[in-house]
Amino acid sequence: MKKLALLLAALGVVSAAAYAAPELTVTSVGQEIEIENQDHYENDLDDVWLFNNVGLAYGDWSFGLQAGKQWGVNFDDDNNKDKGVASEDSRLQIDVWKKVTDDLKLGFRYRGHKNYDRYYARWDYSHGMFWSSGDVWYEATNGSGLTKMTDKVDWVKSEFFPIGLKYGAFKVGYFIDYRKTVGTDDVNQANEYFEHQIRAYATLYKGERLTLTTEGRFTISQEEEFNGSEPATYRHYDDLGRNRIYLGADYKVSENLNVYGKYGYEFRDWKLEGKNAEDHTQNAYQDFVIGWKYTF
C-alpha cells in the first residue's frame, strides 16, 4: 500500500507539472542610445534618446516595456537655441503580442510622450515567401497648439506593409504611410498625408559571432491634402526624392549578450510649391543607434 501511495503521489506531481499554468518570465533586458538629426534644423543634434528595455513572456503572450528620455544638443548659440543640452521629451511604451496561429501574431502598443499619446493595433504575418505587417494607431495630442497645427488636432495614422516577399537572406516589401486628422483643422493646414515606399532588407554577412545587415527605404511618391486651398508656400518630397540606406552590425559577446549598432543616411529632394523660396533646411537626415541586449 505504501508503494502504491508513493506511486500515485509521484504521478500526481508529474501531472500537476505537465498541466501547470504558464508563468510570467523576463526574457530580455537592454539599453539603447539613438541619435536622430536633420541637417540645418533646430539643434546640432535634434533628438538624442536613451531607452531602457525589458522583454517578458507568458505562454503565447509576449510583452515589452520601454522607458526613454530625449535631449536636444547644441554645440553653439544658434538656431535660436542656447548652447548646451536641454531635456525635451520622454517616452513610456508598453507592447503586447499574442501568437494566434503559427503564421500570425496580433498586438497592441501604448506609447506616451509629453505632447501626445498613441494607441496602436498591430499585426505580423509570415507564411512561406509571403509576409505582411503593420501598425494602425490613434494619436491623441496633449499640446496647446501654440507652436504648430499638429499640437492641437488628433490623428489616425498608419504604417504598414500590405504585401512583402522574402527569399533566403533577402526581403522586400511595399510600404504605405497614411495619416488623417480627426476633429477641426485650421484653414490651409495639411490634414491628410500619403506616402508610398519600397523597402528592402538583406543580410550581408553572418558569422559565428558577427552579423552585418543593410536596409533600403525608397520613396516612390508623397502627397498631402489641405483643409481648403493649399497654402501659398509649402514643399514636399519630390517623386523618388526621399531615399534612406542603413548599415547594421550585431555582435554576439556571449551566449546571452549581444551588442549592436546601425547607421542610416537619408537623401532628400524637395519639390517647392507656390512662392516658396529656396529652402535648404532638413535637406538630409541621419540616424545612429547603438545598444546592448541580454537574453535569458
What are these regions, as identified by a protein language model?
Residues S133-Y234:
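Detector for outer-membrane/organellar transmembrane beta-barrel domains
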Residues M1-A20:
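Gram-negative bacterial Sec-dependent N-terminal signal peptides
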Residues D44-L50, A86-L92, N115-Y119, D151-E159, ...:
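Residues that define the transmembrane beta-barrel architecture of outer-membrane proteins
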Residues L24, D60-L65, K99-L106, G128-V136, ...:
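Repeated loop/turn-to-beta-strand initiation elements of outer-membrane beta-barrel proteins
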Residues N52-Y58, I94-K98, A121-H127, S158-Y167, ...:
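Residues on the lipid-exposed face of transmembrane beta-strands in outer-membrane beta-barrel proteins
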Residues Y19-N80, D287, K293:
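Short glycine/proline- and aromatic-enriched beta-strand/turn motifs that initiate or cap beta-hairpins
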Residues S28-N37, L65-K69, L106-G112, G134-S144, ...:
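Transmembrane beta-barrel strands of outer-membrane/channel proteins
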Residues Y251, Y265, H280-F296:
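Outer-membrane beta-barrel "beta-signal"
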